């Protein structure tokens, strides 16, 4: 089993399974997925909030909880670190975790809030030979894979264009849009992206 430490013990780290979304296939949170897996062992969690640390500790029966994620990594030595904080600190934490020589990182979307941050995170992981993945998971969904197979088989004709419609935020939701289009087009190298976004406030802001 691979040992896992989680940074950020909120919704995606620990509690989203309890929200009762009818369309969600469980397990959904990283902690729940670790507990359900035969290949992963959840060993520790880190969060700035004492309340979230205590909730995580009691919910998942994990005694090793930390306020400082760097301390968690140094003391627990996890093989995988899952970063589930808010997006504005994702790249900063990802870079630090890679530089602490953690072998594998799972970083929730968005991996960064700018291309400059993304490039620095990528170069750091390549330099340290960190195995890296992020939360664009729809390419692993059976529905999307069925469409992918239909396109490749020619059963629905020749691929001419892919149009994605989604009422969502850029960093939270349209990451899925871009990755889905890429996946359905066999991950052909992207030459350019153009989109139209509304500047009106989003009706909700995910945590």
Identify the residue ranges that each predicted region occupies.
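Rossmann-fold dehydrogenase core element
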Residues: 120-138, 157-163
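Rossmann-like NAD(P)H-binding beta-loop-alpha module
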Residues: 142-161
């Amino acid at each position: 089993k691979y040992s896992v430490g989680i940074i950020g013990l909120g919704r995606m780290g620990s509690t989203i399974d309890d929200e009762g979304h009818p369309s969600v296939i469980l397990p959904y949170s990283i902690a729940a997925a670790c507990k359900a897996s035969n290949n992963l062992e959840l060993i520790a969690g880190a969060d700035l909030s004492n309340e979230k640390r205590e909730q995580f500790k009691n919910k998942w029966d994990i005694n090793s909880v930390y306020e400082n994620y760097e301390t968690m990594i140094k003391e627990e030595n996890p093989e995988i670190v899952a970063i589930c904080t808010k997006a504005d600190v994702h790249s900063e934490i990802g870079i630090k975790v890679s530089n602490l020589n953690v072998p594998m990182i799972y970083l929730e979307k968005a991996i960064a809030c700018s291309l400059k941050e993304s490039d620095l995170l990528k170069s750091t992981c390549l330099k340290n030979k960190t195995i890296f993945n992020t939360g664009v998971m729809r390419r692993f969904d059976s529905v999307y894979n069925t469409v992918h197979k239909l396109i490749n088989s020619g059963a629905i004709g020749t691929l001419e264009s892919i149009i994605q419609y989604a009422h969502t935020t850029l960093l939270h939701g349209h990451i899925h849009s871009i990755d889905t289009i890429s996946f359905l087009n066999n991950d052909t190298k992207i030459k350019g992206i153009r989109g139209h976004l509304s500047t009106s406030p989003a009706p909700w802001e995910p945590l």
